[in-house]
Amino acid sequence: MQVNPNPNKLSVELNRTSLYLGLLLVFVLGILFSSYFFN
């Protein structure tokens, strides 16, 4: 583990994490809305 990580790599990892969280949020909302409309 590096003591001083590359800030560019860190920002890319943060963007990737936020992207995955956004996709997960859209996926969960899609399931909730589909179950609400088809029920």
UniProtKB/Swiss-Prot annotation:
Principal localisation: membrane
Gene Ontology CC: photosystem II reaction center; plasma membrane-derived thylakoid membrane
TM helices/strands, residue ranges: 18-38
Entry annotated with the keyword Aminoacyl-tRNA synthetase: no
Keyword entries, A-Z: Membrane, Photosynthesis, Photosystem II, Reaction center, Thylakoid, Transmembrane, Transmembrane helix
Compartment(s) where it occurs, according to its Swiss-Prot or TrEMBL record: Cellular thylakoid membrane
Membrane topology according to the record: Single-pass membrane protein
Description of how the protein assembles with itself and partners: PSII is composed of 1 copy each of membrane proteins PsbA, PsbB, PsbC, PsbD, PsbE, PsbF, PsbH, PsbI, PsbJ, PsbK, PsbL, PsbM, PsbT, PsbX, PsbY, Psb30/Ycf12, peripheral proteins PsbO, CyanoQ (PsbQ), PsbU, PsbV and a large number of cofactors. It forms dimeric complexes.
Name used for this protein in its record: Photosystem II reaction center protein L
